[in-house]
C-alpha cells in the first residue's frame, strides 16, 4: 500500500526540475518588466528635454528668464539659450578678428606697392642732347642699309621732359616690351647758317626717316617726311622743323629709331628735336 502511494506521486527529480523552470521564468519576467519600465522612463525623459529645447527655439515658452535666479539657471532651456548665445558671440568675435587682420595685411602689402608703381603705362618721350659729339651714327655703321644717318644719342632721364615707362633705350633705339599698336612720332630741328656767295643756289633737302628693326636683319621703313627749302641769302639763319607720326603694330623686342639727311644741320635742342611712342591698344 505504501509502495503504491510513492509510485503514484511526483518524484524528487521532477520536483527539482519544475522549481528550476519556475525560477527561470520568474527571473525572465522580472527582467522584462524592468527593461520595459526603464525604457519607457528614458523615452519620457528624452521627449521632455527634446520638447523643452525645441520650445526654447520656437519661442513656445514665454516665461521670463532671470540670469541671477538659481531656478532659472538650472532650467535646461535657459542653459541651452545661454550656451548658444556664447557660441554665437565667440564665432562673431573670431570672424571679426580674422577679417580685420586680413584687411590690414592686404593694405600693408599691396597699398605701398600700388602707390609706388602707380598706373601701368607703356610710353616713352626722349629729347635731343645738344653738345654730344656722338649724336649721329658713323657712315660705316651697321645701319648703312637705312637711309640717312641714325640719331644715336637721346636724353632719356627724367631731369627734363624725357621719360621711359615699360620701354627702354639702347643705342638710340626704343626697344618694345609689349606687343600692340603704338603711336610713333618724331620731330627734328634743322638750323642752317653759312656765308652765302653770289650766284650760289642756297637750297637744302631735309628728310626724316623712322625705321624699325624686327627679327628680319634689315631695317624696315615706317615713315618719312621731306622738304626742299631755299632760304634767303639775306637771312642770318635758316630754321625748319619736320614732324611726323603714325600708328603701327609692333611686337616684343622690335626696335624703332630715327635717321636724317643733312645731319650737320640738325640742332638737338631738347625742346625742338624729340622722339617717342606710346601704346594705344
Curated annotation (Swiss-Prot):
Which stretches of sequence are listed as region Disordered?
124-144
Q: Where is the composition biased (Polar residues)?
A: 130-141
| Function noted in UniProt | Cytokine that binds to TNFRSF10A/TRAILR1, TNFRSF10B/TRAILR2, TNFRSF10C/TRAILR3, TNFRSF10D/TRAILR4 and possibly also to TNFRSF11B/OPG. Induces apoptosis. Its activity may be modulated by binding to the decoy receptors TNFRSF10C/TRAILR3, TNFRSF10D/TRAILR4 and TNFRSF11B/OPG that cannot induce apoptosis.
Keywords assigned by UniProt? Apoptosis, Cell membrane, Cytokine, Membrane, Metal-binding, Phosphoprotein, Secreted, Signal-anchor, Transmembrane, Transmembrane helix, Zinc
All ranges on the Extracellular side of the membrane: 39-281
Q: In which tissues is it expressed?
A: Widespread; most predominant in spleen, lung and prostate.
Q: What is this protein called?
A: Tumor necrosis factor ligand superfamily member 10
Q: Which GO terms describe its biological process?
A: apoptotic process; cell surface receptor signaling pathway; cell-cell signaling; immune response; positive regulation of apoptotic process; positive regulation of canonical NF-kappaB signal transduction; positive regulation of extrinsic apoptotic signaling pathway; positive regulation of release of cytochrome c from mitochondria
GO CC annotation, single: extracellular region
Give the quaternary structure: Homotrimer. One TNFSF10 homotrimer interacts with three TNFSF10A mononers. One TNFSF10 homotrimer interacts with three TNFSF10B mononers.
Q: Where does Zn(2+) bind?
A: 230
Q: Name one GO molecular function term.
A: signaling receptor binding
**In this protein, which residues make up the domain named THD?**
122-280
What residue intervals traverse the membrane? 18-38
Query: Where is this chain's protein located in or outside the cell?
Result: Cell membrane; Secreted
What is the phylogenetic placement of the source species in the record?
Eukaryota, Metazoa, Chordata, Craniata, Vertebrata
Which Pfam families did the record assign?
A: TNF
Membrane-protein topology: Single-pass type II membrane protein
Q: Which residues lie on this side of the membrane: Cytoplasmic?
A: 1-17
Q: What family classification does the UniProt entry report for this protein?
A: Belongs to the tumor necrosis factor family.
Q: Which CDD domains match?
A: TNF
Domain of life, per UniProt, equals Eukaryota
SUPFAM superfamilies in UniProt? TNF-like (SSF49842)
InterPro entries annotated for this entry? TNF_CS (IPR021184), TNF_dom (IPR006052), TNF_ligand_10/11 (IPR017355), Tumour_necrosis_fac-like_dom (IPR008983)
This protein's encoding gene = TNFSF10
Describe PTMs of this protein. Answer: Tyrosine phosphorylated by PKDCC/VLK.
Amino acid at each position: 500500500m505504501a509502495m503504491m502511494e510513492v509510485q503514484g506521486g511526483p518524484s524528487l527529480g521532477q520536483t527539482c526540475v519544475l522549481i528550476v523552470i519556475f525560477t527561470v521564468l520568474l527571473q525572465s519576467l522580472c527582467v522584462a518588466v524592468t527593461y520595459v519600465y526603464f525604457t519607457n522612463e528614458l523615452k519620457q525623459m528624452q521627449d521632455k528635454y527634446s520638447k523643452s529645447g525645441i520650445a526654447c527655439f520656437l519661442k513656445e515658452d514665454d516665461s521670463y528668464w532671470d540670469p541671477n535666479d538659481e531656478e532659472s539657471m538650472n532650467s535646461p532651456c535657459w542653459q541651452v539659450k545661454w550656451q548658444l548665445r556664447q557660441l554665437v558671440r565667440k564665432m562673431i568675435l573670431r570672424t571679426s578678428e580674422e577679417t580685420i587682420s586680413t584687411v590690414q595685411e592686404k593694405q600693408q602689402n599691396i597699398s605701398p606697392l600700388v602707390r609706388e608703381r602707380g598706373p601701368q603705362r607703356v610710353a616713352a618721350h626722349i629729347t635731343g642732347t645738344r653738345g654730344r659729339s656722338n649724336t649721329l651714327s658713323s657712315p660705316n655703321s651697321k645701319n648703312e642699309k637705312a637711309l640717312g644717318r641714325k640719331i644715336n644719342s637721346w636724353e632719356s632721364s627724367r631731369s627734363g621732359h624725357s621719360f621711359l615707362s615699360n620701354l627702354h633705350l639702347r643705342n638710340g633705339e626704343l626697344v618694345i616690351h609689349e606687343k600692340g599698336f603704338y603711336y610713333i612720332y618724331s620731330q627734328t630741328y634743322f638750323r642752317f647758317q653759312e656765308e652765302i656767295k653770289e650766284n650760289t643756289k642756297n637750297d637744302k633737302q631735309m628728310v626724316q626717316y623712322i625705321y624699325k628693326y624686327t627679327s628680319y636683319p634689315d631695317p624696315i621703313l615706317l615713315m618719312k617726311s621731306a622738304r626742299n627749302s631755299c632760304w634767303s641769302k639775306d637771312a642770318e639763319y635758316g630754321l625748319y622743323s619736320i614732324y611726323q607720326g603714325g600708328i603701327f603694330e609692333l611686337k616684343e623686342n622690335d626696335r624703332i629709331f630715327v635717321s636724317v639727311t643733312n645731319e650737320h644741320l640738325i640742332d638737338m635742342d631738347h625742346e625742338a628735336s624729340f622722339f617717342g611712342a606710346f601704346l594705344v591698344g
